[in-house]
């Protein structure tokens, strides 16, 4: 948000330099991103008075002027029709620079010498009036720099307002912070309304059909306005904060929004059918042309401001083209309302619209500031346009807006948390300076009852008050001290150790950790094609989601990683190896509280070793993923791992996926993402993913490392090719061998899989390599053969295999 220093000084006395203001605001929690000096885009323009005026002898439309700056008199040739002797005007002297890259030079115009130029507002870049020379107030000192006497120079702070501090989305909100920091009083504008037209009830009415989305709507009628340019002081204020001047009526609504933080809207009354305002939801597919002349197609959830026949504004976002203020507007209906933040946030997102009004409404405005802003705007419009304010105002509030009640503050608790010795009286003064009501609690020492102001929607607990006291007292005023007390070593949590080991191993194998939102789209289950009875379809819904795409809690990490892959692919990055350790949230069938479970998920996509000199490019496949899983378990010293192709997931390729088990306990699944899932996300590249239950793994993980002596004697290997049915899993044969519990068997692994010529149809050849080793002596051939024969026979007996 852009904040003008000169505007701030209207409400609080500031004797700090801009740099000091920036530092104090930042230390109080309002981070100033930049400080900019702004001013007019002209130089060497001074105040002068016309002392003589006559017609140019060689041109009918030009005049010869003599102007004085107090120190000298200069001849000027001018073509403006609005100047007279005695007028005080801006004079661009020789060498002056004005907008457009022009430099004023001494010249002869139709034979007459001109030593400068008399300027219009438009030529100086401080207004849009091009009808003639800018006429200045007669009391301005001659010869003085125009930028100085008109206060055209300013300092603008770019402040990053956090979402919880909507009260600071106004000049007065920031001024209140400065007043609290410096101890200076806050000077609020005096608001007075002179009602000198008929009663508003005669001409207008308001009906709210959806009080949940619009609990408060107020309006005033102003007759006989004259729409025209705003005065210079208002144009300068608006331009300093990045707003363009449009007309006096529209500028007032923007001025009050920036001043008080309450968005307003002015309707041309003649275009309001039946003189009515109806606040309702739109109908599905309803069309509306907004002020930017774009046609919007609405859904059934958009709150609209309508007249007796048609919609005239999108509530809290933008007005309609059909009721905008025009140069010939004479009567206006002025709106000030409170709209539900979630409604405005949803509508702005659905329509792809971002406006200053929506930005404030969706963060929460002051519910008690609606009438104040209405009267302030009516006052200014009447003053600047000559309009007459109708008697009374429409004030519909069918549903009260909830505000925070009293909060109990314990001063000792504050000092205990902060490590300070702030006196209770100082705490009370700090909170009063922030607009809070402070009442001492009867019969207690250093305890208060605090009533937060309605504009502080972020304060609801005692700890919030502690934060307010800390930041205004000054974080740099909190003493630094070391904790005192006996500290005993705390045993490390086994699951924390596990998570550290997982992160370290995956990072070491080229994976990058990502942290994604726990909130996902309700369509995630459909995109993943989860079965109707899958518990992951029972989602936990969020009451006030930021967006519809983040309205439910995730039940798997897979969708989140696929979205990361999608975003990277859209940015042109197709080679990706990522992982996440995070929580999922399951609703369950009992209807009670949801359960949280910790999961590990990995995703790989793209090319494998594409820079390897000895081979061409190859895409990552299922076996690359399986290698990652096996190395992960090896790093954790977990054994008994087996893979089962029966435990399939709907979002995985049925022929390239499997479940992961340790002994008989299911701990996850892995495989290639189903092509249909990738198609729903508009992705074509293969994605290899696995997800594991960290909680289940932690039960099997010891957290300690066991060392044993390695064998000093050589190994002996035997290769055997078995012919087995196609549906027999290799993992089962490996487990049969390992479960034989033969002491000499060190390892067994697959070295070949073949199906084709020489192997009967429906069969496959599976080559296994058996490794034998003793810790006491070199094995003889007979010793190896005896054990090897028993293991091979065990495999044959249990699988029906035959040796090829």
From Swiss-Prot:
NCBIfam families assigned to the protein according to its UniProt record, in alphabetical order? pheT_bact, YtpR
- Catalyzed chemical reaction(s): tRNA(Phe) + L-phenylalanine + ATP = L-phenylalanyl-tRNA(Phe) + AMP + diphosphate + H(+)
What this protein needs as a cofactor is:
Mg(2+)
The main location class comes to: cytoplasm
- Return one GO MF term: tRNA binding
Signal peptide span per the entry?
none
In what residue span(s) does the B5 domain sit?
Answer: 402-480
Q: Report whether Protein biosynthesis shows up as a keyword of the record.
A: yes
Q: How does it assemble?
A: Tetramer of two alpha and two beta subunits.
Q: Where in the cell is it found?
A: Cytoplasm
Query: EC number(s)?
Result: 6.1.1.20
Q: Which residues form the FDX-ACB domain?
A: 711-804
> Any binding details for the cofactor?
Binds 2 magnesium ions per tetramer.
Question: What Pfam families does the record tag this protein with?
Answer: B3_4, B5, FDX-ACB, tRNA_bind, tRNA_synthFbeta
Q: What is this protein called?
A: Phenylalanine--tRNA ligase beta subunit
PROSITE patterns (UniProt xref): B5 (PS51483), FDX_ACB (PS51447), TRBD (PS50886)
* Record-listed Mg(2+) binding positions: 458, 464, 467-468
CDD domains from the entry?
PheRS_beta_core (cd00769), tRNA_bind_bactPheRS (cd02796)
Keywords for this protein? Aminoacyl-tRNA synthetase, ATP-binding, Cytoplasm, Ligase, Magnesium, Metal-binding, Nucleotide-binding, Protein biosynthesis, RNA-binding, tRNA-binding
Which GO BP terms apply?
phenylalanyl-tRNA aminoacylation
Please verify whether the record's keywords include Protein transport: no
């Amino acid at each position: 948000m852009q904040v003008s220093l000169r505007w701030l000084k209207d409400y609080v006395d500031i004797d700090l330099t801009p740099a000091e203001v920036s530092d104090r605001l930042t230390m109080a929690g309002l981070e100033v991103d930049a400080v900019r000096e702004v001013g007019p885009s002209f130089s060497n323009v001074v105040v002068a008075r016309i002392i003589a005026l006559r017609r140019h002898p060689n041109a009918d439309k030009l005049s010869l002027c003599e102007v004085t700056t107090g120190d000298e008199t200069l001849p000027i040739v001018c073509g403006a029709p609005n100047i007279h002797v005695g007028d005080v005007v801006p004079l661009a002297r020789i060498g002056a620079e004005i907008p457009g890259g022009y430099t004023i030079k001494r010249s002869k115009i139709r034979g007459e010498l001109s030593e400068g130029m008399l300027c219009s507002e438009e030529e100086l870049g401080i207004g849009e009036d091009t009808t003639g020379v800018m006429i200045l107030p007669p009391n301005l000192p001659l010869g003085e720099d125009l930028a100085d006497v008109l206060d055209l120079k300013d300092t603008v702070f770019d402040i990053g307002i956090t979402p919880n501090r909507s009260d600071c989305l106004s000049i007065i909100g920031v001024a209140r912070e400065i007043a609290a920091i410096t101890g200076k009083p806050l000077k609020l504008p005096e608001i007075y309304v002179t009602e000198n037209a008929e009663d508003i009830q005669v001409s207008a009415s308001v009906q709210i059909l959806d009080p949940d989305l619009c609990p408060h709507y107020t309006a005033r009628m102003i007759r006989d306005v004259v729409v025209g340019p705003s005065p210079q002081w208002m144009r300068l204020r608006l331009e300093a904060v990045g707003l363009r001047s449009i007309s006096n009526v529209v500028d007032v609504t923007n001025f009050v929004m920036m001043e008080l933080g309450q968005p307003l809207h002015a309707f041309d009354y003649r275009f309001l059918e039946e003189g009515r305002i109806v606040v309702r939801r739109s109908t599905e597919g309803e069309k509306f042309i907004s002020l930017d002349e774009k046609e919007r197609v609405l859904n059934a959830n958009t709150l609209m401001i309508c007249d007796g026949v048609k919609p005239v504004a999108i509530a809290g976002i933008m007005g309609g083209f059909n009721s905008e203020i025009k140069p010939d507007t004479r009567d206006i209906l002025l709106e000030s309302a409170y709209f539900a933040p979630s409604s405005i946030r949803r509508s702005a997102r659905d329509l792809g619209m971002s406006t200053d009004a929506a930005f404030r409404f969706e963060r929460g405005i002051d519910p008690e500031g609606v009438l104040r802003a209405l009267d302030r705007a009516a006052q200014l419009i009447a003053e600047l346009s000559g309009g007459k304010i109708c008697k009374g105002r429409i004030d519909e509030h069918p549903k009260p807006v909830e505000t925070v009640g009293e909060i109990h503050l314990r001063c000792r608790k504050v000092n205990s948390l902060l490590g300070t010795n702030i006196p209770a009286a100082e705490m009370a003064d700090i909170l009063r300076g922030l607009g809070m009501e402070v009442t001492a609690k009867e019969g207690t020492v250093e305890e208060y009852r605090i009533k937060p102001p309605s504009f502080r929607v972020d304060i609801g607990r005692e700890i919030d008050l502690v934060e307010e006291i800390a930041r205004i007292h000054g974080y740099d005023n909190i003493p630094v001290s070391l904790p005192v007390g006996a500290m005993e070593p705390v045993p490390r949590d086994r699951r924390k150790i596990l998570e550290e080991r997982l992160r370290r191993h995956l990072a070491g194998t080229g994976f990058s950790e990502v942290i994604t939102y726990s909130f996902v789209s309700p369509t995630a289950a459909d995109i993943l094609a989860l079965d109707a009875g899958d518990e992951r379809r029972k989602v936990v819904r969020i009451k006030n989601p930021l967006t519809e795409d983040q309205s439910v809690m995730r039940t798997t990490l897979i969708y989140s990683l696929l979205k990361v892959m999608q975003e990277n692919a859209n940015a042109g990055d197709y080679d990706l190896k990522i992982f996440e350790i995070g929580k999922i949230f399951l609703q369950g069938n009992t209807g009670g509280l949801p359960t949280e479970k910790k999961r590990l998920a990995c995703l790989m996509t793209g090319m494998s070793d594409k820079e390897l000199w000895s081979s061409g490019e190859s895409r990552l496949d299922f076996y690359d993923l399986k290698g990652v899983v096996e190395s992960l378990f090896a790093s954790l010293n977990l054994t008994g791992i087996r893979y089962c192709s029966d435990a399939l997931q709907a979002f995985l390729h049925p022929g390239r996926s499997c479940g992961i088990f340790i002994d008989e306990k299911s701990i996850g699944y892995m495989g290639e993402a189903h092509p249909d899932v990738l198609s729903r996300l508009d992705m074509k590249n293969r994605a290899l993913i696995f997800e594991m239950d960290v909680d289940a793994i932690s039960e099997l993980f010891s957290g300690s490392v066991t060392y044993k002596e390695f064998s000093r004697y050589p190994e002996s290997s035997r290769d055997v090719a078995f012919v087995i049915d196609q549906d027999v899993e290799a993992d089962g044969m490996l487990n049969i061998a390992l479960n034989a519990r033969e002491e000499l068997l060190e390892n067994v692994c697959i070295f070949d899989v073949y199906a084709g010529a020489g192997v009967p149809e429906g069969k496959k050849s599976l080559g296994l390599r058996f490794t034998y080793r003793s810790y006491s002596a070199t094995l003889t051939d007979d010793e190896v053969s005896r054990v090897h024969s028993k293991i091979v026979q065990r495999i044959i007996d249990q699988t029906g295999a035959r040796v090829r």
